[in-house]
């Protein structure tokens, strides 16, 4: 009787151990699953916000040919300024990057190229002060308003990108989620630096 009683107690103990192990394994699995899915969702949010930044950059690029042609019609001898804008636009067009290509070096290079374009556009818009007919041209006024709006949206979208990138980075770098991130190739994303106008819309003076 003692033998069977002790064996019964042993079976109960084994079942309890198995239950505890199963609970621990399931807890680890669900935590692991939650951490991984969270990283995927946050990485997708970063990618989506980067697309918003690129869309605003592209919108600005699309405005430039019409703007240059309009200014050229009234200030054709401002060749140097017009050429600067055209060249800066060409450089910016070549620097369109996928989110997976971004690191600190490439983002800094992109910011510099976009900053050069903003500066060239500011100089182009400033010459309207010397040409009253240009300044009064409705197409020019429309382009001016669109450009100002686009510059503001660029600044807003960059700030939003920094926010989601910081949240994503903080999430994947915290222990023990950093172990999951390392296993599945989740890497941190760079930020736009708050210098040289990177965080503020370039001011277009008239």
Label each PLM-derived region with a short phrase.
Residues 1, 11-206:
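A helix-centric hydrophobic-segment signal that preferentially recognizes long
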